[in-house]
Amino acid sequence: MHKKRVRNRIIWTIVAVLIVVAGWFSFGPTGSSKQNDKQITVGVVSQTKEDAAIWKSVAEQAKEDYGIDVKIKNFTDYNQPNKALANGDIDINAFQHYAFLKAWNKANHGDLVAVGDTYIAPIRLYSKKYKNIKDIPDGATIAVPNDASNESRALYLLKNAGLIKLKSGNALATIADITANPKHLKIKEVSADQTARVLEDVDASVVNNTYAVPAKLSDKDTLYVEPINKDSQQWINILVATKANKNKKIYQELVKAYQTKKTQELFKKYYGTKQVPAWNTK
């Protein structure tokens, strides 16, 4: 009997210990659930190794400063990330500029909003014939992209370069909006993918990075770089969320983790002047 009582005491002691241990572990998920609440999924498009390195740094900063786990979801085309955001499949996306977002919201009756600026990829006026914009002669031919948004952007670049003046108040400028052309420039409209190729046939051409990079255009070919001002604000790339979630603290913390000196340094390291941080421009 004595041995039986001892054995029973041992069994109950073990049971009691297991109950206490189980109770202790039951509090563990409370901390974990809080950590899960600090997870955010960011949608990007066709991320390059340079982009990945920048986002890795941002994720490390977000984790260190705010305890946020940043997950990156890569999409293959520009039609997917806004739909995924609107459907709740991701929390934020980072692939578009203000002009693209405005057009998407209008076409899709959307209410997505910018929560932070990232960078701008300035377009440039290139020439194979001249080294200085002041050397462009009277009657010179300047090529610009012929699609509405890129042509407008090119015309605003020519305006900021002092080559033409434009009618004020138009978000999208056209050749018809030119009010002054002191050098009597001939504006040649070509497909955006031809702007780099026609450089041998024109005096200068406005080319964006998509086509300047594969054409191996360099700073020595550059006459003028698009400035970051009120005319180019719509081309700044942004972090985007749904209107309902725009004021969430975690999103503002992600923006802060992105907009750092370290991120600026990485842009300079990987992109030089091709992509420029733009969060201090307003």
Positions of the model-derived regions?
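A bilobed periplasmic-binding-protein/Venus flytrap-type ligand-binding module shared by bacterial periplasmic
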Residues: P122-I133, W235-K248
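Short helix-initiation/N-cap motifs at beta->coil->alpha
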Residues: I72-K83, N170-R197
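Short, low-complexity disordered leader/linker segments with a strong preference
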Residues: M1-T41
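Beta->alpha turn/N-cap motifs
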Residues: Q47, T76-Y78, G88-K102, S191-A192, ...
